[in-house]
From Swiss-Prot:
It comes from Serratia marcescens. Gene3D superfamilies: sav2460 like domains. This is Tellurium resistance protein TerE. Belongs to the CAPAB/TerDEXZ family. GO terms for biological process: response to tellurium ion. Keywords: Plasmid, Tellurium resistance. Not known; seems to contribute to the tellurium resistance (Ter) mechanism. Also involved in phage inhibition (Phi) and colicin resistance (PacB).
Length: 191
C-alpha cells in the first residue's frame, strides 16, 4: 500500500521499494472553475545540484526539452487539457543513471499563459503527485495537495532527493506568484 504524505512529509523510496531502479512520477489536476477558456497546466523538472540551481539550462526538463543530459529523466509529453482521471503528465526517472552532481529533482506545475487567461491555482482542484515503480506499476507514495493556493500560477508539487545512498520523496506543495519565470529564476534557469 502506498504511503500517503502530507505537506512537508517525506518517505524513503529506497526503503519502500528496494528493488526499484526506474520510478515514474505522475502528476494530476482538474480545473475547478472555468470561464470557458481551457486550462493548460505543464509539469516540469529542475535537476539541481547542492546549491539548489540547475547544472545547466539543459537540466530543466519540460515539454520542449524532454530528456536530461544524462538521459535519466524523461518527460513523457504534454497533456493540454488535464481532463479525466489519473495522471495528467508523467516523468520517468532511471535512478541508477542520475548524475552524481544532481542532488534533487524538483517537480513543478505551471499554468500556461495564466496572466493573460486570468487563471491561477485557486481554480484547480484534485492536484496530486505520486511515485510508482515503472517495472510493476506499484504506487509507492502519494501526495494530495491541499487547495489553499488561491492566486499562485506556479506550484512545486514535490521533490525526489538524495539522502546518503537513498532516494527520498518530499511533499512540498509550495505556490509561487510569477509563474514559470519566477520558478526558473529561483532554480538558475535562463528563459
Amino acid at each position: 500500500m502506498a504511503v500517503s504524505l502530507v505537506k512537508g512529509g517525506n518517505v524513503s523510496l529506497t526503503k519502500e521499494a528496494p528493488t526499484m531502479n526506474v520510478a515514474m512520477v505522475g502528476l494530476g489536476w482538474d480545473a475547478r472553475v472555468t470561464d470557458g477558456q481551457g486550462f493548460d497546466l505543464d509539469a516540469s523538472v529542475f535537476a539541481v545540484g547542492e546549491d539548489g540551481k540547475v547544472l545547466s539550462d539543459a537540466h530543466f526538463i519540460f515539454f520542449n526539452n524532454k530528456t536530461s543530459p544524462d538521459g535519466a529523466v524523461e518527460h513523457q509529453g504534454d497533456n493540454r487539457t488535464g481532463e479525466g482521471d489519473g495522471d495528467d503528465e508523467q516523468v520517468k526517472i532511471d535512478l541508477t543513471k542520475v548524475s552524481a552532481d544532481i542532488k534533487k529533482l524538483v517537480f513543478a506545475v505551471t499554468i500556461y499563459d495564466a496572466e493573460a487567461r486570468k487563471q491561477n491555482f485557486g481554480m484547480v482542484s484534485n492536484s496530486f503527485m505520486r511515485v510508482y515503480n515503472n517495472d510493476n506499476g506499484t504506487e509507492i507514495a502519494r501526495f494530495d495537495l491541499s487547495e489553499d493556493a488561491s492566486t499562485e500560477t506556479a506550484m512545486v508539487f514535490g521533490e525526489l532527493y538524495r539522502h546518503g545512498a537513498e532516494w527520498k520523496f518530499k511533499a512540498v506543495g509550495q505556490g509561487f506568484a510569477g509563474g514559470l519565470a519566477a520558478l526558473a529564476s529561483q532554480h538558475g534557469v535562463n528563459i
